[in-house]
């Protein structure tokens, strides 16, 4: 205890006009006698003077503070502390006495607020007020070592008004050194000024670049950058560095911003989901801004994948689908297929301490192929599929379906298994730097195959005359039908035994070629083959694809299709049922039309067709509660004599409904990503898809 007395005596003796009795102070610290403490406190109060609370005395004040905190625990010695406070000459002095006493958490902040209030309201000179404010901040810095110091906004406003422009650097250096939060408007306005119009040294200080040049000072960046700034201010500072094209330490900046987002904003239960989504969107936009300015798409892909991996459990799907779509779209626009692969491969590592199950790969590969298809390079898609699905039968499959020869030689002809396996054909493949996480020893499923068909046919449609495109589709259909006829005997290809590719080809023949009659004939011929029974559900009904809005078929053909569906036990779907409603209504048989409408309602199919709803309203049929009531009201108010806009709207909606048959098997990236993003958050490996109907019309 004598050491405590000596330090306090040394401090007071140095800065006061006359020395304080060292022996009396030592006695005060080494005993709890009331008279001794009162005598010491009184001398301290009289001698402490206006000169004590200055920056140059902070070090010794801290030593005194430490001795007081050692002598007085936060839970005890209340009387002694009260006696010390009572010796203060005014409220300002009392506020500083309290800063020296033990405290923690909110109490420290409250004491600082009191001290700031008293200093600013006192009669001291502006220079003296500045020194006292700095001293108060320095005294609480140790108490808030693990957190940023919340200095009252009033102090920041006072500093902003008092400081000269040439004093900004020293002021900010002091605040950063002591871990003061700079999020208050007045404080951050100084940061903005220094970033936008300051010297290079000022920019480096407020951006913390100054602390990134060596290992020792880097600790300041790592400990304080996300302490003095919140997420939004960090985002602003880093954005300014990107705009300045100052990329030297950009990975450090972006990684610490992501860490701040993951560990604070996204874990804060008080923050709404909308605000959290906004933060993720801002981070993504910053990544893409950096990529655009620097051309570093690699870092964009790596950091976004890392963000997805680190999100709190349960936060995926809707939160990430739009940012992922934007990142993918950007990488595609920049012709960066390799970065797309790295991005998706990185996203699979959702659990750093758990190896992702191989059963999750098919969903990931569907996302990759969907993305690669946007590059309009069928060779790239084929090369990726062959190298992702390492089974030799993959090349045999593409050869038998005519896709291999169409992609590499421009004609749809089958290749024998021997030819497909030959070194000459293998040489056609472009090397793809495929992450090991995306390799399977199996053949692609129907979802992947639909994407491949789309990739190849989209290019062909833009390159060849319409008649040649029609012949290509017919040839591919014949090869597909032949393949499916043999498929029941091939275990390797059981994943393809559904109607996904069938619906896609029929859709293209009916809608892209415009030959509804040919589509009908091909469909009937397909199911006329013996044992041709691919897996089919209401959502995957190929008859709906052909019958919907098809004016090229007759009543007899329609009845044949219905009879065949019944014989095959293929369930009715919306398109087939609504087609029957409209068919009988146009033929004048309203009773049968109503019968089919009743089936439509009982099946709880979505009421998407304006013509069906108009017909129901015209004849007083019951409109189900689940129908789009806004559309029903709109149709009820519509003037039947004004056909032009109504017909136009019907045409648009018909086109949308028809296009669903194609988009169902070639979903845009955000639709494909949704399931993956959701599953990334799960604790167990992904389950293999039980049905590929969502991947095809």
UniProtKB/Swiss-Prot annotation:
Residues 1-65 form a transit peptide. Disulfide bonds: none annotated. InterPro entries: Atp22. Its main location: mitochondrion. It is a peripheral membrane protein. GO terms for cellular component: mitochondrial inner membrane. GO terms for molecular function: translation regulator activity. The keyword Metal-binding does not apply. Keywords: Membrane, Mitochondrion, Mitochondrion inner membrane, Transit peptide, Translation regulation. The keyword Mitochondrion applies. It is found in: Mitochondrion inner membrane. Translation factor specific for subunit 6 of the mitochondrial ATPase. Required for assembly of the CF(0) component of the ATPase. Belongs to the ATP22 family. This is Mitochondrial translation factor ATP22.
């Amino acid at each position: 205890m004598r050491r405590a007395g000596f330090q306090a005596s040394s401090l007071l003796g140095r800065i006061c006009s006359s020395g304080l009795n060292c022996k009396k102070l030592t006695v005060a610290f080494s005993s709890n006698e009331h008279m001794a403490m009162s005598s010491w406190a009184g001398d301290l109060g009289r001698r402490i003077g206006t000169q004590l609370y200055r920056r140059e005395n902070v070090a010794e004040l801290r030593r005194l503070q430490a001795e007081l905190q050692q002598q007085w625990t936060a839970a005890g010695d209340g009387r002694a502390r009260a006696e010390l406070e009572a010796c203060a000459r005014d409220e300002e002095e009392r506020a500083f006495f309290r800063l020296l006493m033990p405290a923690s958490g909110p109490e420290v902040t409250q004491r600082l607020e009191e001290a700031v209030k008293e200093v600013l309201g006192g009669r001291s000179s502006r220079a003296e007020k500045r020194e006292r404010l700095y001293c108060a901040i320095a005294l609480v810095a140790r108490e808030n070592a693990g957190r940023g110091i919340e200095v009252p906004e009033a102090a920041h406003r006072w500093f902003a008004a008092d400081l000269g422009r040439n004093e900004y650097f020293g002021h900010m250096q002091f605040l950063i050194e002591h871990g003061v939060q700079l999020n208050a408007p007045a404080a951050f306005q100084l940061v903005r000024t220094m970033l936008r119009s300051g010297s290079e040294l000022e920019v480096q200080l407020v951006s913390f670049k100054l602390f990134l040049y060596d290992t020792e000072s880097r600790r300041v960046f790592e400990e304080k950058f996300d302490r003095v700034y919140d997420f939004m201010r960090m985002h602003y500072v880093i954005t300014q560095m990107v705009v300045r094209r100052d990329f030297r330490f950009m990975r450090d900046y972006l990684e610490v911003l992501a860490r701040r987002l993951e560990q604070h904003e996204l874990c804060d239960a008080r923050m709404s989901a909308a605000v959290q989504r906004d933060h993720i969107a801002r981070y993504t936009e910053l990544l893409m801004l950096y990529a655009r300015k620097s051309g570093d798409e690699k870092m964009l892909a790596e950091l976004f994948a890392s963000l997805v991996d680190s999100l709190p459990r349960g936060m995926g799907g809707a939160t990430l689908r739009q940012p992922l779509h934007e990142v993918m779209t950007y990488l595609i626009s920049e012709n960066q297929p390799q970065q797309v692969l790295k991005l998706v491969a990185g996203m699979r590592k959702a659990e750093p301490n758990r190896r992702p199950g191989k059963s999750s790969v098919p969903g990931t590969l569907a996302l990759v192929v969907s993305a690669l298809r946007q590059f309009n390079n069928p060779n790239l898609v084929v090369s990726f599929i062959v190298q992702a699905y390492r089974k030799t039968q993959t090349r045999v499959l593409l050869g038998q379906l005519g896709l291999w020869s169409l992609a590499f030689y421009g004609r749809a002809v089958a290749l024998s298994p021997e030819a497909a396996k030959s070194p000459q054909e293998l040489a056609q493949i472009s090397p793809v730097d495929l992450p090991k996480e995306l390799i399977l020893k199996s053949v692609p499923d129907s979802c992947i195959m639909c994407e491949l068909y789309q990739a190849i046919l989209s290019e062909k449609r833009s390159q060849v005359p319409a008649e040649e495109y029609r012949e290509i589709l017919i040839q591919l259909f014949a090869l597909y039908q032949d393949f499916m006829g043999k498929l029941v005997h091939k275990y390797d290809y059981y994943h393809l035994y559904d109607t996904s590719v069938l619906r896609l080809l029929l859709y293209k023949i009916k809608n892209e070629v415009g030959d509804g009659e040919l589509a009908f004939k091909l469909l009937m011929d397909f199911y006329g083959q013996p044992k041709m029974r691919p897996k089919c559900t209401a959502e995957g009904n190929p008859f709906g694809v052909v019958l919907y809005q098809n004016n090229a078929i007759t009543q007899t053909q329609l009845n044949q299709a219905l009879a065949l569906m019944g014989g095959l036990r293929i369930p009715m779907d919306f398109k087939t049922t609504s087609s029957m409603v409209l068919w009988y209504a146009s033929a004048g048989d309203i009773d049968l039309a109503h019968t089919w409408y009743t089936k439509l309602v009982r099946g709880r199919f979505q009421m998407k067709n304006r013509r069906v709803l108009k017909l129901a309203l015209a004849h007083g049929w019951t409109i189900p509660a689940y129908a789009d009531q806004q559309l029903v009201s709109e149709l009820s108010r519509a003037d039947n004599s004004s056909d032009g806009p109504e017909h136009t709207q019907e045409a648009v909606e018909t086109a949308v409904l028809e296009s669903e048959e194609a988009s169902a098997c070639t979903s845009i990236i955000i639709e494909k990503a949704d399931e993956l993003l959701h599953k990334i958050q799960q604790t167990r490996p992904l389950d293999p898809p039980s049905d590929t109907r969502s991947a095809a019309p």
